[in-house]
């Protein structure tokens, strides 16, 4: 049993800035950061809102590929949440897709204080090979990759078992275990465990008294 309930308080979080290119980041990467990437409509915005307990923090769009900027949110205790552009949506041109993938690659190569890369994937979809490659790249760069299977509440028990089996197979394929969370932003399932994981990984769990629910 976790020492915190699912309502474990998370640091107060506010929108900080957006950048279109990595050369605009200046000293944004001088503080600890966690980043969220995933295909369009993977549930990134909903997750950020649930994680921060701030419904309007990240705007949820029904239009695939709406997020094309790197959006940075900063917590009261000084670490960044970085929302990376969605990718892989069908309406994007080949050039747009390539540009976004280059942006993601450049981010992994240049963001100095990146501690965790969260890779989101809708539980109703198969886990793409491209994401496995991203996990391997992150590991090579000493960045902790963490997979989040979102919208887990949309599946019945059989479907959830299939997703877990799929992730076990993915770990076997690359030969290295990685952390996986099964999350529902709408019901709150897994949110408390995710908050706890973030605070412990960043070494700020002792500052719980300074955060707000």
UniProtKB/Swiss-Prot annotation:
User: Which segments constitute the EngB-type G domain?
Assistant: 30-204
CDD domains per UniProt = YihA_EngB (cd01876)
Q: Which GO terms describe its biological process?
A: division septum assembly
Q: Name one Pfam family in it.
A: MMR_HSR1
The protein's matches in InterPro entries, at most eight in alphabetical order, are given as:
G_ENGB_dom, GTP-bd, GTP-bd_ribosome_bio_YsxC, P-loop_NTPase
Per UniProt, where does Mg(2+) bind? 45, 67
Q: Could you say which residues bind GTP here?
A: 38-45, 65-69, 83-86, 150-153, 183-185
> What is this protein's function per UniProt?
Necessary for normal cell division and for the maintenance of normal septation.
By sequence similarity, the record places it as follows: Belongs to the TRAFAC class TrmE-Era-EngA-EngB-Septin-like GTPase superfamily. EngB GTPase family.
Spell out the HAMAP family in the cross-references. Answer: GTPase_EngB
Identify this protein by name.
Probable GTP-binding protein EngB
């Amino acid at each position: 049993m976790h020492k915190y309930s699912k309502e474990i308080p998370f640091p107060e979080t506010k929108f900080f800035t957006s950048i279109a290119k990595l050369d605009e980041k200046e000293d944004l990467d001088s503080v600890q950061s966690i980043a969220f990437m995933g295909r369009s409509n993977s549930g990134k915005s909903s997750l950020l809102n649930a994680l921060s307990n701030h419904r309007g923090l990240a705007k949820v769009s029904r239009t695939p590929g709406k997020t094309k900027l790197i959006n940075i949110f900063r917590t009261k205790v000084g670490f960044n949440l970085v929302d990376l552009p969605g990718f892989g949506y069908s309406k994007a041109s080949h050039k747009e897709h390539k540009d976004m993938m280059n942006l993601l690659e450049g981010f992994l190569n240049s963001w100095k204080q990146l501690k965790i890369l969260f890779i989101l994937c809708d539980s109703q979809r198969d886990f793409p090979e491209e994401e496995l490659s991203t996990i391997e790249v992150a590991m090579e760069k000493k960045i902790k990759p963490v997979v989040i299977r979102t919208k887990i509440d949309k599946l019945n028990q059989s479907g959830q078992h299939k997703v877990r089996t799929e992730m076990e197979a993915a770990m076997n394929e690359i030969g290295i275990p990685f952390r996986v969370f099964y999350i529902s932003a709408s019901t709150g399932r897994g949110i408390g465990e995710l908050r706890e994981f973030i605070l412990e990984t960043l070494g700020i769990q002792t500052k719980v008294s300074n955060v707000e629910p």
